[in-house]
Amino acid sequence: MSVPSKENISLTKEDLRQLHVSTSLYRWFLRYFPDGGTYSAIHSELIKQRRTQWIESFIQYIYLRHFSDASFAKQEQEVMENILFLLGNEQQQGVTLQRLPYHNTLPTSENIQFSTEWHQLILKSQQLSTDLALCGNNNIVAFSGDENSISNTGYSNQLMNTGFAGKVCNTGNQCRIGSLGGRSRICNSGNDVKIYASGNGVHIANSGMRNFITASQDRAKVTNTGDLAQINVTGNNSVAINTGDNCKVTVSGDDSICISTGDLHQFCLGKGGSAVIAYHDGNRTRFKIFYEGEDGIIAGVHYYLDENQHPVAHIKQNSTSVN
């Protein structure tokens, strides 16, 4: 059982009452977390019990409420690592398929499984250069070998890859993609998807709407064409390119660049960072260029552009100080 602290993202029974969750979920929460619980602890318990039908809603709530928190990326990485740990013995080799409790046990000696109707599989692999094509819903996949590839079209799947140079291609909605290895490549066209990458030199391409994208290490490159995206790039020497409308882009690493041709909702720069933002003056498209440390642009502060294309600092509610 985990008791929340001020440093951790947490959830309480009062939060669940405000969300009007189902009776079964509320009772489950009271049983395991009567005093509230941290994001990591609650997520781990859901994974342990294979409560896949609740995981996506829980993650959506956490992202909507806490994505902009300074500690979010660190806690999200902890959650990703817990998924890998909870799926079984780390020393186990090969491919493991595990059915949920209400299914019959499948043979585990086969390296390839084909399915047209089985959903909610638990799949773990530590082999190298493994390719997986997934079309079911509510599955949990964890790959830890190098140069693995995951292709997914199913909804509400949890896709984790910790190996070097892993590739994930996703078209399913409401999925979650986690990549902890360096030089990974992620391509997504699904909507309402959460993408987290913590390796160096990752490339992420997104065209889905209402997605959350986090890249926490250096030399990341993120390209987004989807509307209503929230992008958080914290590594140094990174680049975020956006063409979607009503997006929020944060490139808080040192010497990083934000380029946007879409109708940008907010932007934020790090030390030595710069932003190139397009706007229409009524006759043609023009560009405004902003540099951290010049014209009042402060690292770590979110800005939006007023009708004259001047940057205005966005002050969060409940803020006690203004820079």
Task: Please describe what each predicted stretch is.
Residues 1-323:
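Short, glycine-biased loop/turn motifs at secondary-structure junctions and
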